[in-house]
Amino acid sequence: MKRAVCILFLAFAAAMPLKASEYKFDNFSANVTAENLEAFTKDMGGLLGSGTYSTGRILGWGGFLLSARAAVMPEPSEENTALGPDPEVMYMPWIQGEIGLPFRLDGFIRATSWDGLTLAGGGLKWGITRPVDTLYSFQTMITVMAQSGVHKDFSLTHYNANMVISFKMPVVTPYIGGGVDYTKLTVEGADNAALIGMREYTTTPRASAGLNFKLPAYIDLSVAANYANYGFGGEASLGVRF
């Protein structure tokens, strides 16, 4: 168990230096405009909604999962110049904890502090099918989540709902899912004072397809590609699961 937790901690620590040096939220105040705010909000919704699930199977009563997760947006959408005119890769890591509850429910919380943005939230997962580990069986679940974030130049509230299905195989479990992200963003600081207090509301679709691996020492690994407002992106999770 100690070894598994150490691996998880090191994986999260190793992800921290991945921050793109020229693509920071601190550039928001100098570059945000009334024209690019909507695209920025849509891209943030897709990024924050990524990585909510890594299989279609709920944990089940008494189950537990602690994971380090990350999502990547290779470049923003064309209209999103709110962090600068030159597109750069953007990462968002976080810690997510999940616990199995009665009535085919899982509860989870997630949190991060990254590039000046502090974000926290949580949600529920409901298994449409009962959790089983039978080979070549399908598992399906629905997830809902809410989270809020604060940066010195903007604040946001994000909600999403997803449906995911996975197929149990001997070594790997493929999964596909889709959902909707609803994001509200408020400008808190901008060089153009007329923008302060401006709010943007967006609703965008998102889809993902990935692979989940059960490794020795209770290690749970998943990698996936996703598609959101910004185009194709990626997400990954490394955790300890019981």
Give each language-model segment a name.
Residues P87-M92, F108-G122, V150-L156, Y201, ...:
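Solvent-exposed loop/turn segments connecting transmembrane beta-strands
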Residues I7-A15:
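Bacterial N-terminal signal peptides
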Residues L66, G97, L101-D115, S137-S148, ...:
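Transmembrane beta-strand segments that form the barrel wall of outer-membrane beta-barrel proteins
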Residues I142-K214:
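Outer-membrane beta-barrel translocator/channel fold
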Residues A71-E79, T112-G116, T129-P131, M145-D153, ...:
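Sequence/structural signature of outer-membrane beta-barrel proteins
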Residues S21-N27, Y201-T203, K214-F242:
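Predominantly the C-terminal beta-signal and adjacent terminal strand-loop region
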Residues T55, I95-L101, G122-W126, A161-F167, ...:
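Residues on the lipid-exposed face of transmembrane beta-strands in outer-membrane beta-barrel proteins
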Residues A20-D133:
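Transmembrane beta-barrel domains of Gram-negative outer membranes and organellar outer membranes
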